[in-house]
């Protein structure tokens, strides 16, 4: 019967997608870091999202024009921003759309302290802010763990991948969420002294 066939096809696609995400998560290569204009990365992600999964959303750019270069792998950072925009778009009421704000700013005093006592200054701040319903309170503390999702059909690997990429960049990511406003904030380092700007 057609209904059963549709169900089987749908479940098969879901399983294939899940396996692809597990493979991507396990096969992530170390970042090839260089000086990166994070605004270029955000713009690429914005344009891609508006042509695809977040076409129903309004995306606002709120950038600090004096922001210096970040130290990172532009392709991996693009994946991070795409995942965050996709999550924001999926969280919004698709009939009404919603607004995503991409914000950057410089915070010279933000420092990541590691368990071994070492630390690193992470002055470049990137935020992806949406006006969706917010994250469920019961998963807030675990949202970056694999297989934790607030959506019925979510795999829980998108934000785990985001967290792994940011960690591999010696960065930090956090989330603050209330109904009507969710903010994912990434903090990244500047390039080491002597690294030339991108060509």
Predicted regions located by residue number:
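A conserved beta-strand-to-alpha-helix junction within the catalytic ATP-binding
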Residues: 34-46, 103-105
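Short conserved segment of the HATPase_c
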Residues: 121-123, 135-146
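Histidine phosphotransfer helical core of two-component systems
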Residues: 1-13
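Short beta-strand/loop element within the Bergerat-fold HATPase_c
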Residues: 97-110
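Detector for a conserved hydrophobic position within an alpha-helical segment of the HATPase_c
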Residues: 166-167
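Conserved catalytic submotifs in the C-terminal HATPase_c
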Residues: 56-68, 107
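Short alpha-helical Gxxx[C/S/T] motif in the catalytic ATP-binding
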Residues: 158, 162
């Amino acid at each position: 019967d057609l209904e059963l066939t549709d169900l089987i096809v749908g479940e098969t696609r879901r399983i294939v997608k899940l396996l692809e995400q597990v493979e991507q998560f396990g096969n992530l290569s170390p970042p090839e870091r260089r000086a990166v204009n994070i605004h270029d990365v955000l713009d690429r992600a914005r344009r891609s999202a508006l042509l695809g999964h977040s076409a129903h959303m309004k995306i606002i750019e709120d950038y600090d024009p004096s922001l210096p270069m970040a130290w990172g792998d532009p392709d991996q950072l693009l994946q991070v921003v795409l995942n965050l925009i996709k999550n924001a778009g999926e969280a919004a009421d698709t009939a009404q759309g919603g607004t995503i704000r991409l914000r950057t700013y410089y915070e010279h005093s933000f420092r990541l302290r590691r368990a071994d006592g070492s630390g690193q200054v992470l002055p470049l701040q990137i935020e992806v802010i949406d006006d969706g319903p917010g994250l469920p309170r019961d998963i807030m503390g675990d949202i970056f763990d694999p297989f934790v999702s607030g959506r019925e059909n979510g795999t829980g690997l998108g934000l785990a991948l985001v967290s792994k990429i940011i960690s591999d960049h010696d960065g930090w990511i956090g989330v603050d969420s209330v109904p009507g406003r969710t903010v994912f904030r990434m903090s990244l380092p500047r390039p080491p002294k002597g690294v030339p700007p991108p060509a």
